[in-house]
Amino acid sequence: MCMKKIYLALFLSLLTLSSCNKGVISSTPLTSSSSNEIIKSEIKNIIDDYKLDESLSFSNYLKYSFRSHVYFNNEYYYFNYKEYEVEYYENNINIKLVDNKNTNIINVQNVELMTNLEVNVGDIVKTNEYYADTNKGGAKYEICSEDSLFAIALDNGLYAKPIVENNSISIESLGAYGDGIHDDSQIIINAISSAKELNMDTLFFNSSNYLCNSKLDIGEVNELALLGNNSTIIVNDNYDDTDYKEFFLNIWNCNDFLLSGISISYDFSRAINGIKTQVGIHNSKKIEYVNSTFNIPDSTLKLQTKDREFTNFDCYQGWEDIVINNCNFINLTDSSAGGSLWIRDFRNTGSKNIKVLNSYFHKIAHDELIAVFMGSIQNVIIRNNTFKVEDSGESSSVMNFTFGSASSKLADNIIFEKNNIDVCSTGGLIWSTNATNVIIRDNIIKSSISSKTNNNFRMIESLNENTIDLIQNNHVIFSSLLKDYSFQVHIFKNIKEVLNNTVEINCKITDLFLDVNSVIDNICNIYSNVDFISYNTKEKFKSNKISFNSCKFGSFFRYYGITLNSNIDIVDNIINYTYSESSEDASYIIMANDMY
């Protein structure tokens, strides 16, 4: 683990620390030594799981891992864990029970009962819940003479202003129901947009379900964390679709914004006309979305026209430094447009630095699982994700992934690694255009031709020459869900280097390596007829092992219509071929035509 030195010591409270002397605080331990050691071990285990390259900051990791406000000062991190307060610095651990003893505080069960209390300006009131019989939303209030944001009007003409302790509060303490029945849209919008006024940097969502039937427009928010409790924002039939709104959760001009454990799910039983993409990000920096699910169920499309588009997530334009980690993207609409995650720069303002990590993607809709396209995009990492596309829908993806497109001015440094892929499509797995420094490595790939395919199939292809630099250490299983076809099928096309892959071919293909510069150290097991193994390899075909299992090839090496400006090394390959040929179906090791 790479981070600054860390130490845990006793301290009195985060609120005290934010306004008083900072440093190591002495206190009499309130728990037994053995209990303390158990808690310390739990904290250490969580911290040890921190991976520097999987979060925008160590502070963010602490926030969503411990689900706590985090205060940082002079290399000290202060946060809560269970009923304990923690100060963290330099790899030693000490803890203290939170002191909940309150003096001079008036206790009351809920807000309704608070309104008729006989209180004076300056009094502090503590509630156990916001609404009666909900057991959530408790908070402290300061009695004031003037109204203010989220203040409660009292019967005596005074106001109870919620106290934002340690720069954090729950959305339930501000009046959200969190019951999936009452619409919480406006309270959520007001709370987030007023974070600076409330002196709040952490907003907790403590309930399971929040009904939101208005667009959540979040703009110009800085240094804020929304921490859910496996919470889901539900959009149902009462959504306000009188005007078209492309993005439901619309994040714009924000900086340093963390969302964790806050999922979004559509739940429609009528046609909804004013909704499309669940999350959109525009002109924003340092956005981290973790531990959440974006769900568009199959029922959504059944109520719509087939040409409607539904997409989970769209990094739309002008973004920088985004992390999406441990999320689920479910899009089962079977629509003729829409996909899982768009990474684009719509107005060519420049976008860079995004990581998509440890997530699950399941899609039936027509378009890509992940598409990197349009404008100028730099530095994309797609790592350790699981992708699933089955052949059950009426619609099917043309390609599963796009890395650069005809609309791309720049698509540079795209790394696709350590993913587990089980997909089908009508056109191909990965297509790349106008991209540079594209690397595909260490993936497990099961790619199939869809039963709906009626045109040529290219599994991994650069649509202009050599935009994919390297395909390395992948395990590829290729097959077809279409029993009979006459179109061309290409596996690797226009690649600079294909290195150390294991490839299994279970259906008829045209060629395995087409216009690949170098093919080195690959193991290929072929179980169906193939026309060509290597077509116009330009530099090296070296140390490969190619095995044919009761099937034949037309020509192993095929060269046609190219200029040879340098030597081509074909060395140290092993070819296992036991097919019994006849004079009518003879195979050729090398065939060359129209060379110059």
Where are these regions (language model features)?
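Fold-core signature of tandem repeat domains
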Residues: 324, 354-356, 380-382, 414-416, ...
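Extracellular beta-strand/beta-solenoid scaffold signature
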Residues: 188, 212-217, 238-251, 268-282, ...
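Classical Sec-dependent N-terminal signal peptides that target proteins to the secretory pathway
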Residues: 2-26
